[in-house]
Amino acid sequence: MNDYVPTTALTAESATTSIDVPTASTSLLTDMYELTMLQGALESGTATRRSVFELFGRRLPGSRRFGVVAGTGRLLDAIEAFTFTPDQIDFLHRTGVVNDETLDFLRDYRFSGTIRGYAEGECYFAGSPLLTVEGTFAEACILETLALSIYNYDCAVAAAASRMTIAAHRRPCVDFGARRAHELAAVAAARASVVGGFVGTSNLEAGLLYGIPTVGTSAHSFTLLHDTEEEAFAAQVASLGPGTTILVDTYDIATGVERAVKAARAAGGELGAVRLDSGDLVAEAFKVRAQLDALGATSTKITVTNDLDEHAIAALGAAPVDSYGVGTKLVTGSGRPTAALVYKLVEREGADGTMEEVAKFSSGGKSTVGGRKWAGRILTAEGTAAEELVVSSGSQDQGLAALDEAGARPLQVLL
């Protein structure tokens, strides 16, 4: 696809689909204290105590009213690859990170517990138990950093994408953030953007891994390469066809629009779209739409880029724009680059073998609520989400029964 106006719809579910690719070990994508805690627990005899960890946010970043779950599929893949290779064991031994007993445990490490969580694309609020990890303390504790690393970034991007998609009022939004982030983060951002409602990406690696439709045609450098703008546009149309999207603001926008339409018609077709990347986008969109219509190019679409966020997109709502390309603000969470999620122990096995609720008490808003949580969504008769109910219960049967009694749809699924 070479058009900036994608025609292929993509769902949050399809963003979790990937091809089989070799995955390197993820076990050292963690903080050192995860392993030193493991060592201490092995020495104190508490490492095998059954434990329940929850991943949640104490509050939402800024003044935002909801978050969007993303990263679940990536985390499950990362946990599958969470094994310690001989080279990694050697590194931990040489640097004295942990002792030999702990290294023996890590050599054979495979997560064998259970994980429940919200499906990708679900909205959430402060306190929502997005992920519940149950296993021994040893095997569940050391997943903390990895889980937070993936969820904090992916949820931040998905929330930003959702806000932008809402502001766009059904006009398609496309990820252009590859050059504005770490090369691997950009791939994750492309995936999360689709969970949040975007319909395509410029990132080819994301297209390969996740089946996301890819878009892209040319930059200003392609126009500058040629001796004239006419030659550049003719070359692009000859290569990509008249349905391509041409960037028309390298020199004069009005002249660029006229030349782009002419180049497409010389090839026997109508121009697919023009892209605006500078200036007052609202004013320019009105001018360009009027010019295209006057030229008879009524089917030619207008796509805009240039440091867009949800506020800029909302400001363009009345303008005759057909699609948006978003880069920097998307991959940085539109000013909130982390979802501010935490991973806390909420229940653990006591010395007598019974499960006990545990919680952190402290000032400064960093306390936690003990006990395993079960969450459900209550819908109106019209199917609109009205509220989220969270109940604390150590028993799955009791937790689900409480949700059912309130008429709430359970949000956590076995992953």
Task: Name what the model sees in each region.
Residues 2-49, 59-61, 97, 103-112, ...:
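Buried, small/hydrophobic-residue-enriched core segments of structured protein domains
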Residues 2-49, 63, 294-295, 300, ...:
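Gly/Ser/Thr/Ala-enriched C-terminal appendages of enzymes
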Residues 40-98, 166:
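Extended boundary segments
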Residues 52-54, 112, 173, 342, ...:
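A residue-level signal for beta-strand positions that form part of recognition/binding surfaces
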Residues 56-58, 118, 392, 414:
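A structural detector for beta-sheet-dominated domains
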Residues 76-82, 117-120, 124:
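An N-terminal, globular interaction/scaffold subdomain
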Residues 247, 275, 303-305, 325-327:
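Short, conserved beta-strand edge motifs with alternating hydrophobic and charged residues
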